[in-house]
Amino acid sequence: MTGIRQTFTTLVLTLTAVFGSVTGPVAIAEDRWTEGQHYQTLTPPVAVGRGSDVVVTEFFWYGCGHCYTFEPMLTAWGKQLPDGAVVQPSPAVWNDPMRMHAKAYYIAEVLGVKETLHPVVFDAMHVQRKRLASRLELRDLFEDNGVDPAQFNKAFDSFGVDSQVRQADARARSAKISGTPSLMV
């Protein structure tokens, strides 16, 4: 249990440093964290299915400018986490465009191209100003980045991808998130 507490303390301090660089000075002493002001305790706790690991769930949306800015920092930070701590991205799903973007995330994961296409989707929306609100727009983006259109279509229509999108929606509702990016530890 001591290892988990030490990992959690390191995680809290690191998240504070990351957010501090984005949002300005933040006190990092643990006794200055106030429930309801700096964080919320989820009741009941949200299960993440990772055993004894410390899981940082990142709720994001490809259309969110703050998520676009935060993603490179979170990715770099996630690579430095100690054993037993992981970052688990989870697309937020509140409406049809977000559902389409969540499908893009899980299609990339199923096809084994998530590491490559995750930043590409963000760039397409925020740099190239693409909406990516339709199957065709997503398929074209994936095809432009080396994905076979037939494989894309198969994944798009799959029960597995639809199931993952539904699970992401349920996870965000359980966590009671009200905006993106949001983190749950």
For the regions a language model picked out, list residue spans one by one.
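Cysteine-centric redox/oxidoreductase cores and disulfide-bonded domains
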Residues: 93-179, 184
